[in-house]
Amino acid sequence: MLKTEMRNPRTMHIDKMATEEMVDTMISESYNAIKAVEGAHKEIAKAVDVISEAIAKGGRLLYIGAGTSGRLGVLDASECPPTFGVSPELVKGIIAGGNECMFKASENAEDMAAAGERDIVANNVCEKDAVVGISAAGGAKYVISALKKAKEAGAAVIGVACNKDVPIMDVCDIFICADTGPEVITGSTRLNAGTAQKIILNIFSTCTMIKS
């Protein structure tokens, strides 16, 4: 079983906790996200260099993901123009199911492999670009299919997941595993996995813009 889907022994009885204990437990568990990112710092640095090279060649940074992972990519991309004064086309976020899935969950979108390919083609991904696929569990068919198509187009391909030995790693030039472990609520990867992913994406965009 994937670690992100396992039950967390420290929160088995969180529903019985007093409010303050519940809050303290969630704060304590959130440190796992920071530790997971620290553990992947070498791969993150390699990815920053690859993304920076893509930007220097006149390429773009594209994030692609489903659900929370996709939303985090769109969020990071949307903050780049006001923060760094760059074109909205330089850093783009693509979410499975389209922009309406930013506001309304579509649980089947992550399994639509053909849509991943289509979205890469629709965004004219080429050899100048760097594409970051984000999948907490590491097996979203939409993301894996998109990364395969991006690699066919000659783009640099980076994968971000929160489990080891998962399908996404087989299609990446660089694979980043932020091993966040079991969530406070079983399988709710919007929590620690999402926090770790947001930190990583913040690092990608910020360090890249500083280097550019």
What are these regions (language model features)?
Residues 1-36:
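Cofactor-/ligand-binding subdomain signature composed of acidic, glycine-rich
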Residues 6-9, 45-49, 60:
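Short, positively charged patches
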Residues 29-39, 105, 130-133:
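Short, basic, glycine/proline-bearing loop/turn elements
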Residues 39-54:
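A short, well-structured juxtamembrane/interface segment
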Residues 54-55, 150:
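A generic structural signal for well-ordered alpha-helical segments
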Residues 58-59, 154:
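Glycine-centered short loops/turns at secondary-structure junctions
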Residues 61, 65:
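Substrate-recognition element of Asp-dependent hydrolases with the DxDx(T/V) motif
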Residues 66-212:
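Glycine-rich phosphate-binding loops that contact phosphosugars or nucleotide phosphates
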